[in-house]
């Protein structure tokens, strides 16, 4: 007990004396040593249980119990630490450390959100947009609740914020596919803000990828160019979002009839394309099929329709070779519509109508497909107003576009 009492920093000396009295009585010492210097050395050096010094200390303190005044450190040759006199304790430091690691999150809360972000990205095109919105929106609200209504560590907060941003990117894509302009921009804004706070600039870049695509199909190429440039300014070097935004920049220059810039940027993109897989599904992936599709659209805008046919057919071939073609129905439909536009310009409307029917046969008529098909139908009517196949296609298109875009996609 004496050893414990001596080693407890800041223990009041009257308590220490009481402990010594108990120990001295138990050991029944008959000889009393009065060498206080040896006692002081024992205390200051830490002492060991096997040392005999505690017995001398017991004798001294037992004798001192008869004193009127309580014992002081000087009575034992022991100097109390300065910081202890100021009220500093190890317990206070331990409390600070505990505060830094205190969390109300359950094991798996963050990991579960991370998993669903990957799942939503990979299986995006296999779910009805209405169903998908409900699922992603619930997860986004869950992330918000964990951030605002639960205690968490700074590290956990940063990761939750990053995941919240990625969920908002997915919600922005759904809003884009539904043609919801204000909602798309709002979720892009939120994703950018979350990425900045989480110091996850790839989230910011992905938000600008959505904003760029949405503005392009909405007929605002300069807004799309601004978004691509902004995204590239923060995209981490070597990240696939950087290459995707570079490819976006190439087709935007084509859309703006800037042939030389398109050629330069597309050459830069091609230097990386050999390292890409031919086809890969998901919102956050990039493959050679996407680049071929981007090039087909670009060549149509530049008026190079024969080259556009080749690029569109390459993209279509890549998508059809996918183990699960239904995982990229929108990109496949866009490539088929680009092929139809090229055939229209080359004077073969029957092939144009055939390619367009294949594009609309996938059953997932998102806003970008609707806009592209309406443009195609306008070009066909402008050039071949008397052709029966063109009139029939116009009626079919109106029927297709009247269907509920929230309906589940048709099985492949």
Q: What is each residue range found by the language model?
A:
Residues 62-78, 291:
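Short C-terminal boundary/hinge segments that cap the last helix of small helical domains
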Residues 11, 98-102:
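Extended, low-complexity intrinsically disordered regions enriched in serine/proline/glycine/threonine
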Residues 1-26:
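A short, Lys/Arg-rich alpha-helix, primarily the initiator
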Residues 101-105, 110, 114-412:
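Conserved binding/catalytic microenvironments
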Residues 72-94:
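Domain-level recognition of soluble alpha/beta enzyme cores
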Residues 46-69:
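DNA major-groove recognition helix of helix-turn-helix/homeodomain DNA-binding modules
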Residues 22-49:
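Recognition helix of helix-turn-helix/homeodomain-like DNA-binding domains
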């Amino acid at each position: 007990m004496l050893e414990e009492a001596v080693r407890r920093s800041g223990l009041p000396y009257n308590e220490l004396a009481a402990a010594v009295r108990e120990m001295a009585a138990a050991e029944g010492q008959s000889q009393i040593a009065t060498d206080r210097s040896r006692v002081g050395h024992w205390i200051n050096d830490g002492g060991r249980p096997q040392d005999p010094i505690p017995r001398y200390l017991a004798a001294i303190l037992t004798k001192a119990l008869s004193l009127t005044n309580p014992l002081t450190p000087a009575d034992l040759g022991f100097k109390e630490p300065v910081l202890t006199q100021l009220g500093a304790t190890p317990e206070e430091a331990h409390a600070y450390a505990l505060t830094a690691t205190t969390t109300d999150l359950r094991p798996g809360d963050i990991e579960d959100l991370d998993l669903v972000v990957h799942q939503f990205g990979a299986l995006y095109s296999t779910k009805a947009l209405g169903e998908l919105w409900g699922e992603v929106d619930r997860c986004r609200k869950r992330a918000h609740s964990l951030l605002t209504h639960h205690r968490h560590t700074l590290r956990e907060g940063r990761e939750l914020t990053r995941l919240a941003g990625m969920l908002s990117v997915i919600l922005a894509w759904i809003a884009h596919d539904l043609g919801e302009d204000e909602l798309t921009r709002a979720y892009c804004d939120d994703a950018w803000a979350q990425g900045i706070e989480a110091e996850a600039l790839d989230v910011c870049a992905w938000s600008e990828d959505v904003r760029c695509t949405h503005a392009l199909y909405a007929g605002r190429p300069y807004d799309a160019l601004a978004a691509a440039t902004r995204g590239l300014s923060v995209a981490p070097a070597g990240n696939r979002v950087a290459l995707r935004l570079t490819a976006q920049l190439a087709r935007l220059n084509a859309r703006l009839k800037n042939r030389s810039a398109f050629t330069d940027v597309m050459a830069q993109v091609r230097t990386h394309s050999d390292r890409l897989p031919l086809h890969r599904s998901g919102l956050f992936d990039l493959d050679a099929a996407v680049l071929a599709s981007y090039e087909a659209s670009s060549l149509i805008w530049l008026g190079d329709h024969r080259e556009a046919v080749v690029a569109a057919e390459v993209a279509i071939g890549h998508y059809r070779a996918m183990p699960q073609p239904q995982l990229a129905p929108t990109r496949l439909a866009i490539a088929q519509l680009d092929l139809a536009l090229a055939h229209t310009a080359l004077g073969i409307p029957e092939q144009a109508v055939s390619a367009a029917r294949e594009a609309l046969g996938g059953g997932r008529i998102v806003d970008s497909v609707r806009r592209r098909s309406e443009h195609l139908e306008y070009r066909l009517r402008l050039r071949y107003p008397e052709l029966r196949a063109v009139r029939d296609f116009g009626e079919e298109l109106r029927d297709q576009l009247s269907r509920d875009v929230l309906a589940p996609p048709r099985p492949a």
